[in-house]
Amino acid sequence: MGRLPIAGKAPILTRLMKTLTIAARFCGPAASSNGGYFAGLVATLASRTLAVRLLKPPPLDTELAVRDLEDGTLQVVHAEEAIGEARPAVLTLDAKPPPDYLEAVEASRRYAGFRYHRFPSCFVCGTRRVRGDGLRIFAGPMPERGVVAAPWVPDASLDRGDDKVRPEFMSAALDCPGYYAVAPDDRMMLLAEFTAHVDRLVHIGESCTLVGWQIGSSGRKHEAGTAIFDGRGELCGKARALWIEPRSSGESRA
């Protein structure tokens, strides 16, 4: 989904950690990365749970430097400009219980993106992405449960090499259902911060279920929780996201 352009002041850096490049396949908007995928790449690089703050849209097919700052923050940089920052985090979040797989299939038929989609090429939830290319996670409402839900069967292109889904794709899958949990009316929102924790990688070809729910709202800020469950209904990963509605052009900044 969309990304939040907000200015950030960088702490003093200590060393260059590594570089990463986001392939065009993994876009959210057409010209920038899906936020959950970006966050997952950074967390995988660091091998720990991180709260990833998106400062600018992460560019595609471009080498990005990852810097380790002296305060423990990781900073992702392009052309000396901070794209994102990440800090170590402990994710405290009680996951909503999942529907069964067939209930999730039924919910996905009510996916709002079938009527209108701001980013139809999104790697995670885009309706123009074909099987084997996009994740095609179409989270539809289940009002009786207070969640949105979607089925997901990971394809072979997501394989880590051991018949399990790579962790950055688990993180990506946990992104967009949160948007549809907090924006059922398809209002414009931008992802500001994303914290994902993966307990266990799901298998390629496994019939998984995703749920998303609203945690709370305050003005333009909306928090969402998401979770992914394996074919046995066991929790495998979860995420907490902060989504922000952009100010209208005439709105005061006070």
Where are the regions that the model predicts?
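Ser/Thr/Pro/Gly-rich low-complexity, intrinsically disordered segments
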Residues: 1-4
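Non-catalytic linker/capping segments at the edges of enzyme domains
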Residues: 7-19, 71-162
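Intrinsic-disorder/low-complexity, polar/charged segments enriched in Ser/Thr/Lys/Arg/Asp/Glu/Gln
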Residues: 15-19, 49, 145-149, 193, ...
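Hydrophobic beta-strand-centered segment that forms part of the acyl-chain substrate-binding groove
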Residues: 26, 30-33, 38-65, 69-70, ...
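Residue-level detector of beta-strand face positions
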Residues: 51, 73-77, 223-227
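Short, conserved beta-turn/loop elements at beta-strand boundaries and strand-helix junctions
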Residues: 70-74, 217-220
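A mid-sequence, solvent-exposed acidic-amphipathic segment
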Residues: 135-199
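Accessory, usually C-terminal, subdomains that scaffold auxiliary metal cofactors
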Residues: 196-253
